């Protein structure tokens, strides 16, 4: 089975169309995250989701349980991807209230740094037990977490993918030029790209989107 592809940080309906036509499996929209240059209102996100012919993913962070439930009811996504300080207890409470998949982003160090595999694996196990359906392994830097364009440690990601019972997406610094190598090295369930296929924040390059999908899915 070929690797799944998620095109994230979508802000324009034409980019949603390109992503779907290129073979992306998931279209991600950042919703109500003020610090993100790709953030959309829930009304804008619903407009974009209406244009999608593939599974939709809401990406948000640091909201209360009630706010998350309300957001899911408004947008009816395939998955809710959480990038903030959410706890396993919040995930467990949310799991009982929504029917969509719940994905949790976990911060990995940049390729130039190291981290405790055991600590990260314990996080995965704790969130999986609480009800997470998938994890997004993304790069954490001093500049932020997610959408940084900084390559994560593939060595650590590969260990987590191998040891996790739950599907893991690889994110962080992926581009059409390195995604095939990343998939071969890490063997993730899926890959998640935003800045690596952009002209500017939130504006996708159609050729890069198409090439990224082709390169990702050609890897055995």
Question: What positions do the PLM features span?
Answer:
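Conserved N-terminal beta1-alpha1 strand-loop-helix module at the mouth
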Residues: 1-190, 195-220
């Amino acid at each position: 089975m070929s690797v799944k592809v998620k095109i994230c940080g979508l802000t324009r309906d034409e980019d949603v169309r390109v992503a779907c036509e290129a073979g992306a499996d998931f279209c991600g929209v950042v919703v109500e995250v003020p610090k993100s240059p790709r953030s959309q209102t829930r009304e804008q996100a619903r407009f974009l989701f209406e244009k999608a012919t593939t599974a939709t993913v809401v990406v948000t962070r640091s909201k209360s349980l009630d706010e998350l439930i309300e957001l899911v009811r408004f947008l009816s996504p395939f998955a809710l991807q959480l990038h903030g300080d959410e706890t396993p207890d919040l995930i467990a409470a949310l799991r009982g209230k929504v029917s969509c998949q719940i994905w949790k982003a976990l911060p990995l160090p940049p390729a130039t740094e190291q981290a405790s595999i055991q600590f990260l694996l314990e996080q995965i196990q704790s969130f999986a037990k609480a009800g997470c359906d998938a994890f997004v392994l993304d790069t954490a830097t001093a500049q932020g977490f997610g959408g940084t364009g900084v390559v994560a440690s593939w060595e650590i990601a590969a260990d987590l993918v191998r040891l996790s019972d739950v599907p893991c997406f690889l994110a962080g610094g992926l581009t059409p030029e390195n995604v095939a190598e990343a998939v071969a090295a890490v063997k993730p369930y899926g890959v998640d790209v935003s800045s690596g296929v952009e002209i500017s924040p939130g504006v996708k390059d159609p050729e890069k989107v198409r090439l990224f999908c082709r390169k990702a899915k050609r890897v055995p």
